[in-house]
Amino acid sequence: MTRQVALDKVRNIGIMAHIDAGKTTTTERILYYTGRLHRMGEVHDGGATMDWMDQEKERGITITSAATTCFWAPKFGNYEGEKHRINIIDTPGHVDFTVEVERSLRVLDGAVALFCAVGGVEPQSETVWRQANKYGVPRVAYVNKMDRTGADFFDTVKSIKERLSANPVPIQIPIGEGEIFAGFVDLIRMKGIIYDKEDGSTYEEVAIPHDLENEARTWRINMLEAVSEVDESLLEKYLNGEDITEMEIRKVLRQATLKVSIIPVLCGSSFKNKGVQFMLDAVVDYLASPLDDGEVEGHHPRTEEPVVRHPNDDEPFAGLAFKIATDPFVGKLTFFRVYSGTLKAGSYVLNSITGKKERIGRVLQMHSNKREDIDCVYAGDIAAAVGLKEVRTGDTLCDENNPVVLEKMVFPEPVIQIAIEPKTKADSDKLGMSLAKLAEEDPTFRVKTDDETGQTLIAGMGELHLEILVDRLKREFKVEANVGQPQVAYRETIRAKVDFEGKFVRQSGGKGQFGLVNLTVEPLEEGKGYEFVDAVKGGVIPREYIPAVNAGIQQAMKDGVVAGYPMQDIKVTLYDGKYHDVDSSEMAFKIAGSIGFKGGARKASPVLLEPIMKVEVVTPEEYLGDVMGDLSSRRGHIEGMGQRAGAQFVHAKVPLSAMFGYSTDLRSMTQGRANYSMEFESYREVPKNIADALQDKRVTKDDY
C-alpha cells in the first residue's frame, strides 16, 4: 500500500474547547462534509459518532479522545481543489479529563480552538490554551453557536485577546447574530456568504450587505495590519497603498499562524451546518503539516547522545504511543504517532523505554470506534496498533537497529482518592486485573493498597473521573464494586535544611548488618518532586550500595512523618558514611537511608499540604452574595468577579477537602440556576488546627 497523500498535504489536528462549546457536533459535521458519515449524529440524542462510550452517550460529554481520518479539498485559497488528509482527535472538555487533552496535543501539529459565542472564553478554554502554548501548537479559532440568543462574536474575540493573552485576527465577521445569523463576510475575498435556511449545507456568494460595508472594511484593515506586521514586503506594500492579493494574505497568515503570533478567527453554527466547510478550508490553509513541524529531538537510550528524526519515510521508524485503549473486539489498542520512517503490520518494534521488542499484529486506521485494517503507516500518520502488550502511554516505539527515546509526557498527580471493594467473591477475582487495565489506559488514574487496612484505593483527577472509571468497571469488565467517601490526596513536605545521620547496625552473632549514611535533607521548589544527589567522595561507601540508599529514602517518602502521607519536593544529598567489609549489604544501606531520611525530615520543619482548587462559579446576580459567602465559609479565597453573558462569575481558590458535594449545595442555593467548574491549582500548607485533626485521625488509623 503506497502513501495516499503527500506529507505536506497531511494535517494532524485536535478540536479543543470548554465543555458544551459544541466540539462533538462540530466533529460530526466535519465527518459528514468530508464524506465519512452518511447521517449526522446529534449529541443531545446520544447518536454522535465520536462519542462512543456508553457513559459519553448518556452524559453528552466526550471522555476519551476518539481519533478519526478524513479527506478534504478546499474550494478556495492557496490549496484550492487539492485533496488533503486530516487526522482528527476529538478531545474532552471536562476538566477531570485534561490528561486526554494533554496527550493529544503532544502529538498534534495544529488545533481548532472552539469557543461558544454566548459564553466566550470559559475556564476550561484557559486550561486547554495553556496546554497548547506549552507544546507550541498552532491554532485557528472557531466561534461556534452564532445562532444562539446572546451570541456576540466581537465580545468573544475581545475575551480571547484579554483572557488568553492571544492575538486573535478575525478573517470573517458574522452577518447577523442569534436567530438572524445568516452567514458571514469573508474578509480575505471581501464577499458575503449567505446560507440556505433549510439545511444550511448550501450557500450562495453575495455582495457584502450594505449595513456591514463599513464594519467589514474596518475589520479587513485590522487583518491587513496584523499580517503586515509579520512580513516586511507586505508592510511596504500596505504603507504604499498597493493592492495585496488573496494569495499573499493567505501565505503570510499561514506563516504567522505557524509561529502562533496570530490566531485566525472564524465563525459559524455547527448545529445549523453553517461555517464548517470554511473552517476545514482554514485547517488546510493555516495549520501545520508534519513537514512544517520539522525534526523531533530525542536521545539514544544507552549513550544519552542526542538523536534527531525527520518526517521522512526513508528514515528509521520512530513513533510515540500517546494513548492505550481496551477494545471489546481486538483487545488492547495502542494509538501512536509516526515521526519518521514507515511501519508494516506484522513487523517488530523496540520499546526504547522498557528495552523490549514487540510484534505489531495489525495496524488500524480509526474512525471513531470503527476500524479499518491497513498494511503500512508512514511518517506523519496517526494509527492504532494491535498486539503490543507492555507499552505504556508516552513510550517511544522505534526501529530496533536505530533506537531513540523521544521526549516523554509528564502527567499531573491525582488529587482525590476513594476506597473500593468488590461486592462478591467473583468480583474480587476480576477487580485487580480490571483496575490494572484501566490504569494502563489512563496515566492519571492510580491503584494502590493501603498498608494499614489492606483496602484497595483508587486515585484520580476529580469526582467525575473516578465515578466514570467505576462505571466502566461495571459496564466493560462486569465487576460490581462498592466505593467509599472521596478522600483528599494530602501530601507532606519540609521547610528547613538539616543534616542527619542514619545508622543501621545489627551484630549479635552470625552475619551482622552495618550501614551508616550522612544525609542533607532540604526543601525543593514546588512541583519538583524528588532529587537525590550522590556527593560521596573517596569510596567511604562502595558504589554498589548507593542505589540502595536512594531506594530506602524513596520508600520512606511514601509514608510521611507528619500524618503518614506521601512526601514531595525534597532534595536529599548523600555526602558521607561508613561501611563494614563483612557486615555491610544493600539491605543495611537501604534501611540506613530510610532511617536517616525519616530522622532528618522530622527535624526539617515538616508540614502537611492540601490540594487547592481554582473554582469558577457562574450565577444569576441575585445569588451572588450567597455564593460568595458559601465559598468563604469553605476556606475559599475570592480572587475576582465580573459579568459575562448576563450572569455574574466569581473566581476563587478553595481547598479540595471543602468542595466535596458542592454541586448539590450550589444547586439548592441557586435553585439550579448556577454552575461551576474546578481544576487543580497547587498544593498549599494546611492550617494548624486542621493539620492537628488530620494527625489525630491518622494516629487512630480511622482515615480509610
Curated annotation (Swiss-Prot):
It is found in: Cytoplasm. Its main location: cytoplasm. Keywords: Cytoplasm, Elongation factor, GTP-binding, Nucleotide-binding, Protein biosynthesis. InterPro entries: EFG_II, EFG_III, EFG_III/V, EFG_IV, EFG_V, EFG_V-like, EFTu-like_2, G_TR_CS. GO terms for cellular component: cytoplasm. GTP binds at residues 17-24, 90-94, 144-147. GO terms for biological process: ribosome disassembly. GO terms for molecular function: GTP binding; GTPase activity; translation elongation factor activity. The keyword GTP-binding applies. PROSITE patterns: G_TR_1, G_TR_2. Residues 8-291 form the tr-type G domain. Belongs to the TRAFAC class translation factor GTPase superfamily. Classic translation factor GTPase family. EF-G/EF-2 subfamily. Catalyzes the GTP-dependent ribosomal translocation step during translation elongation. During this step, the ribosome changes from the pre-translocational (PRE) to the post-translocational (POST) state as the newly formed A-site-bound peptidyl-tRNA and P-site-bound deacylated tRNA move to the P and E sites, respectively. Catalyzes the coordinated movement of the two tRNA molecules, the mRNA and conformational changes in the ribosome. NCBIfam families: EF-G, PRK12740.1-5, small_GTP. This is Elongation factor G.
